[in-house]
Amino acid sequence: MSARRDLVLAAAAILLAAVLIAAWGHQAGRPPVKMITPTLTNRLELCLTCHDGIEEISASHPVAAFGCTTCHGGDGLALDADLAHAGMYGGPNPADLAVVEVACGGVNCHSGDPATGRDHIQRVNRSIQATYAGAIAQVRHAFGEQPDLTAHQGTHAVQDDQVVVSPDAVPSLTAFAPSATDPQPVQQFSANCLNCHPWAQPAAKPYFYRSTGCATCHALYDNDGLYKGSDPTISRTEPGHASAHRLTTAIPYTQCNHCHNRGNYNLPRMVFVERTDLPALSAVKTEDATARRLAEYYQPIGQFTRCEWELDCVDCHTAREAMGDGDIYSSQADAQYIQCRTCHGTLTEPPKLAAITDLNDVAVHQAQVNGKYALQVGDQVVVTERGEKLGQVRWSADQLVQTMKATGQTYNVPLVQGSACQQKPDEQASRYCHACHDRELKAP
């Protein structure tokens, strides 16, 4: 009975498509109709008629399998733009956190089993980036709204029924929504200082352009916010678009900079003060790459180790640091655990290594999705204090080698053991390494 019903529905869809195509073809200047039938849905789609040339979103989301409406929603049989786009999830961005469960969820997609790393949506919603709970707790505590720095509120309400990773985690947050009776600085903080998290819309200006939700990090934007791809329907002159219709885990530091390192907060006034020393956009092609990176990345008087300005942020910060590990934290310090010693070891201990024993290992899947490095059974890779395998840092020929996730470039990782380093056993946090290993941009 079910098979017969499916045949009837398929025949009806084909008949409807034929009618639409005939009507479309009678209008002058229309592009030829382009039809696909994605294997995951087995439903005809006409979206590529207008969006012919658009980039495939990623190798793990092939259009032949997913099509367009699986992720975007909308009406895949409509050839009128307004009708086709009606009912789309999140408008142009199905990765927005308000709709991501509908667009990207499902046990086989991004809201599945934590054991297989498929619980991306749950983890992101609880992450310190999404909740902004640390900053909110600091401000509320400073102005007498709560007795300590334990987080009680976030940008949105979130619940964790089972704290599994860290004893520093909290079980839930309520939504931060100051009223007219709250201290004025708390109200100003709410109005002026909550636009740098994945729920918030970015400032529509150069250097700040980005998307929201998962696409905040995974959809790359140029500093000018202009589209450089091949979809004829997307403007090349209107800022506010990703550089291409793609998602990636090969994320360069420039993407992180759309939120981070764009200025500082004026705490007495509770306003964001933008940097005035950023290079002009026109200097991108003409300025020495190293000089530009130092100028754009570092604020004056900041100390940074050599690796921090040669590598990208994702080469040190793991997915579970940035996207969350499933627990709800009160501060960034509670969520962050990668230190210099993770890869470089100490005077008394080398970095911890673990073997890849199964091709279904999460680390192998991460390597396949990234595409800049590969893993096989038997490889020895660095493992964090929380048991997370860093597949891009691998033991090879008596040497620890790191592969950059954004470019594929490799570096030999020097170990503290056997070096001239004079670190103290009780001073292992990265800030102590910075005291000697720094590249400082002097104030003008």
Language-model features, listed with the residues they occupy:
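N-terminal juxtadomain amphipathic helix
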Residues: 79-95
